[in-house]
Amino acid sequence: MRSVDSLLLLGLTGLASQANAHPAKRQPNDSPLSKRGVDLDAFRLPELAKYVPQDEVPDISNARIAPSSDYTKTAEEFVKSVVGKATFRLVSDHYVGTNGVAHVRFKQTVNDIDVDNADFNVNIGADGKVFSYGNSFYTGKIPGPLVKRDTSDPVTALKSTVEVLDLPVDASDAKAEPKGDEHYTFTDTSGTVKKPEAKLVYLIDGEQNLKLTWRVETDVLDNWLLTYVDADKTEKVVGVVDYVADLATYEVYPWGVNDPSKGSRSVVEDPWNIATSEFTWISDGSANYTTTRGNNAIAQVNPSGGTAYLNNYRPSSSSLEFEYTFSTTQTDPVSYRDASITQLFYTANKYHDLLHLLGFNEAAGNFEVNNNGQGGAGNDFVILNSQDGSGTNNANFATPADGSPGRMRMYLWTYSTPRRDSSFDAGVVIHEYTHGLSNRLTGGPANAGCLSGTESGGMGEGWSDFMATAVHLGARDTRSTNHVIGDWVYNNANGIRAYPYSTSLTTNPYTYRSVNSLSGVHAVGTYWATALYEVLWNLIDKHGKNDADTPTFDSNGVPTDGKYLAMKLVIDGMALQPCNPNMVQARDAILDADVALTGGDNQCELWTGFAKRGLGTGARYSSTSRTESFALPSGVC
């Protein structure tokens, strides 16, 4: 599955409901679907997962499982012990993380058909025992075997999808060509990036009922959708997942300079880390390039906003000198497109290398063409579109499953004269790329649709803001320093969020209960990033802050400073948590990540940070009435 996340749908929705919110700001561009009156939030999948952290896994559970040198076998036996007679299959994206924890995922099946939102993830510790697990398997009544043609025609499901979601797709003459067992590709359609597909799957709906559905995949560029259409009543859409999430020598704003208002451009030489980009940034191991293309990314302008990218304009330099002039006073984007593409290529590659060091490597599902035998599925660099003409005042990232390229689209912003190019705002670029990180890790690389709920989707936005903020902490920053997102592109010192990221409850009053009155994933994400900001500074106060571009590690693979340790624990937590987690579960996964990595050395700092913002030991999740808690577990500090 795939996810699409946008930067500027970001979080301005829901601000009016906050009595103490800042004055309303101009609303950045909505998605094309919302412009056509389609509310995708109404079709979000239910959040079903349960997460059992390491300190709650019963000892008897491990005692009942025969020891095995194959961690997948251990995980499989554990699932059998928990789910009884439920049928399931092993997903092929299992791997061992850099913290020594193996991640194994299973998909529930009914009548040999996948239950698309029923997942079981088992985390196996370095000792070979079950460390923690997540479970969203269906436990209700199982329907009988299907009778041939018990279901509607897949073409009807495609047409219903187009009609209900008002998609810009012509399916009037669509024909279904078999691709596999109850899996079809549609021909004679137009309006999509690639041919639409439909597959018969079960889905657990919001009423906890098991529905047989056609999963219809349509990539219309602005939205890359998995639409679940009732296979009995094909006019009814049961749920929707959107893969798109809205944000040599190179003359660039160097790493650490967030945008043109924060510093100056300079020429950097061979900026790649050969340990994480072994072919450099301008080769994929098979071909060497003299342009902004390589193993991790391909960058170009896309003024038409179309789907083609391979033959779009990008700068070329036989001498490998990507040095181009740029001034913020230039009014014509064409006049500085070389500088824009180069900056986007540089920032995305630098972030790729950093994430690789922190654990988002080939086996974990990162974005590379040639994985060089390191695991995972290749052929999936990130397509980086600068000056994308499909919109303004936004940015987005589409995350398909491992093995298909990610797609980032960076727009021009019109809140200033001249317009501002978001490719020069590293915070926006990092925000967008982080959607690829969180969607690939949560639920496993083969399932990029595990942040499709309101709270889990909100955390997706929060992780993106958090990582961008952590990267750009300044050398003189302290826990009293506040940070905002998008202030340069938005031409507003307050940025694009309701509040700055701050450890002050006066400056930013959000606590877990605040989420009850927030609407939209970007507003929810602001709270989550606020909680993580508290954790970040607690760890920095304990371990110090490394202001270098890359972390240093001790002999056990633990970052030696608080900033990179916080980022590492957040990333490791993503891999531990279940599909579509809530914030209490994600908190527990980060706490577990610390146990796995450091033996629990930072439990006090983590709990104190979360509890300050209402995610203490008594916090409870409910989609309509979250209960906050400021209490710490007994003896944790």
Curated annotation (Swiss-Prot):
Entry superkingdom: Eukaryota
Function: Secreted metalloproteinase that probably acts as a virulence factor. Cleaves Z.mays Endochitinase A (CHIA) between residues 'Gly-29' and 'Cys-30'.
Residues bound to Zn(2+): 431, 435
Gene Ontology BP annotations: proteolysis
Name the record gives this protein: Extracellular metalloproteinase MEP
Gene: MEP
Family: Belongs to the peptidase M36 family.
Keywords of the record: Glycoprotein, Hydrolase, Metal-binding, Metalloprotease, Protease, Secreted, Signal, Virulence, Zinc, Zymogen
Native source species: Fusarium vanettenii (strain ATCC MYA-4622 / CBS 123669 / FGSC 9596 / NRRL 45880 / 77-13-4) (Fusarium solani subsp. pisi)
Signal peptide (UniProt feature, chain positions): 1-21
One Pfam short name: FTP
Coiled-coil segments: none
Keyword Chloroplast among UniProt keywords: no
Active site per the UniProt annotation: 432
Record localization: Secreted
